[in-house]
Structures are given as structure tokens and as C-alpha cells.
Amino acid sequence: MIQSDTDFRTLVKTFQHKVYNHAYRMLGNREEAEDATQDIFLRVHGALKNFRGEARLSSWIYKITANVCISRMRSKQP
């Protein structure tokens, strides 16, 4: 699994475009999607120790992506 900074950099390179595109589709704003993508990878990095491998890594990352985007959309509602 992810055991070093190099491994995490590889993970980011592998998923950054897919995560950004998913965030952009959900948020509809380029700058918001870029900010969300950074936030998502910070959360992924912090939560990797909790990843149990019960789901595919990509599914886990996309779930974090959806949760971050939903949270951002809710915070913008009046």
C-alpha cells in the first residue's frame, strides 16, 4: 500500500485528473473544483491509515471526492 511520500505522489498523479473531473462535474466551477481537489488529496493523505482495503482504492477516493463536493455545495446554500 502507500508507505512513502513517493507512493503518495504516484497516487496523486494516477488520480488527480479523474478526481478533478468528478469534482468539476459536481461543482460546475473550475476554481472550486481545483480547490476541492487539493482538499480531497489532503483528506486522502490523512485518512490512508484508516483505509482497510475492503473496497478498491479508486472507489474509496471517489467516495471522499463526492463527500467533499457535497459538503462544499451545502456550505454555499443560503
Q: Positions of the model-derived regions?
A:
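Generic leucine side-chain signal with a strong bias for well-ordered alpha-helical environments
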Residues: 11, 27, 42, 48, ...
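Residue-level detection of beta-strand scaffold positions
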Residues: 8-9, 26-27, 65
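Structural recognition of an alpha-helix C-terminal capping motif at a helix-to-coil junction
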Residues: 21, 35-42, 55-67
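Arg/Lys-rich amphipathic alpha helix in sigma70-family domain 2
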Residues: 50-52, 66-78
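Short alpha-helical functional segments enriched in proximate histidine and acidic residues
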Residues: 22, 26, 47, 68, ...
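A short, charge-rich alpha-helical start-of-domain segment used by transcription regulators
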Residues: 2-21, 34-37, 45
